[in-house]
Amino acid sequence: MGNCFGFSAKVGNRESPYRGSSRISAKRSQSSRLSSLTIQSSSYNDDTSVASLQTPRSEGELLASPTLKAFTFNELKTATRNFRPDSVIGEGGFGYVYKGWIDERTLSPSKPGSGMVVAVKKLKEEGFQGHRQWLAEVDCLGRLHHMNLVKLIGYCSKGDHIRLLVYEYMPKGSLENHLFRRGAEPIPWRTRIKVAIGAARGLAFLHEAQVIYRDFKASNILLDSEFNAKLSDFGLAKVGPTGDRTHVSTQVMGTQGYAAPEYVATGRITAKSDVYSFGVVLLELLSGRLTVDKTKVGVERNLVDWAIPYLGDKRKVFRIMDTKLGGQYPHKGACLTANTALQCLNQEPKLRPKMSDVLSTLEELEMTLKSGSISNSVMKLTSSSSSFTAKQRVRTPVADPVLSSRRCRRVR
């Protein structure tokens, strides 16, 4: 199976349109042993269309796409004020992201401050995202449309080396920045749940379309002005499995701390691998801690290993909660979210819930925040929690990351 464009992605280190994290390409043994919990089930419904992703497309076909605009290089040069340094809103191994302006109706470049703001991703010629991966991302976002996927407006390809992508502008940047950037304003509990629901909705949509995201992480969750979450960066996405196949085999690519243990160990990936990554992000939202924190020692260095003993015990959940919340969160809601994360992090992929079920649970949790009470069906989760002893846990081996120089700047 290939990625959304139809061939294997071999990427060493690629990052989100605004910021990224270190990737891993080494195999590791399996992670912490987790218990099996039951998550409430309901059907996932969305009125957004799911396009077929079975037929690979060439660049020539992309040029004829009715949903994407083929920008000229000069148009994007004008929109970004000649790619001026003070227009840079993000940088990574892939290249740079610039803030630009285009006319909302004609999509022609416009003066700064007029028209529609866009994010223009300009790939480095020697960057980590090759031409095929660029085509894969264009193809995926050109076919898949959902309120929780970042909108791809158009693209530009000039010669053999100049490649650009034009996205809708996400003024709040990435979730990673809000959680971990020094001096960032703390995210309130309600907003964290809102972000988790938006990301879960986008991931559930992809899984319904038989797409495995393969790179779910905080830096790939972008936020609009109202903190609505949208998934970005689809260069590693894979289609499948199809027919009687239960998984897709691929070269191990992902981000340290987020990749599911069975994927790192075997190269076999399923939608449940994305579910594991979602569990890691839930932990980040709960704790405000990095997945891998090199400033810490021992078990505290790895977020999953450190948090597991507390997730299933409602008397200990407070120990993992982000101190920046100042205790301003509902205890029962925190327990439910922790249990949901625990289920997603189950060592056995088959015992992890579907993203549609995770979404249903989080949506009901959001309703309880508005009504002020936890329903009986949701309470069953918190009462069925299981704790772990040190002997039951198996520490997650940490592979050496593929490091890159990263920085992120934002333009107001």
From Swiss-Prot:
Reactions mediated catalytically: L-seryl-[protein] + ATP = O-phospho-L-seryl-[protein] + ADP + H(+); L-threonyl-[protein] + ATP = O-phospho-L-threonyl-[protein] + ADP + H(+)
- Membrane topology designation: Lipid-anchor
Compositional bias, Low complexity, is annotated for: 21-40
Q: Which residues carry this modification: Phosphoserine?
A: 219, 249
Q: Where is the lipid attached (N-myristoyl glycine)?
A: 2
Where are lipid groups covalently attached, annotated S-palmitoyl cysteine?
4
Q: Where is this region: Disordered?
A: 14-40
Phosphothreonine modification, residue list: 72, 250, 255
Keyword match Phosphoprotein: yes
Family from the record: Belongs to the protein kinase superfamily. Ser/Thr protein kinase family.
Q: What does this protein do?
A: May be involved in plant defense signaling.
What is the recorded name of this protein? Probable serine/threonine-protein kinase PBL4
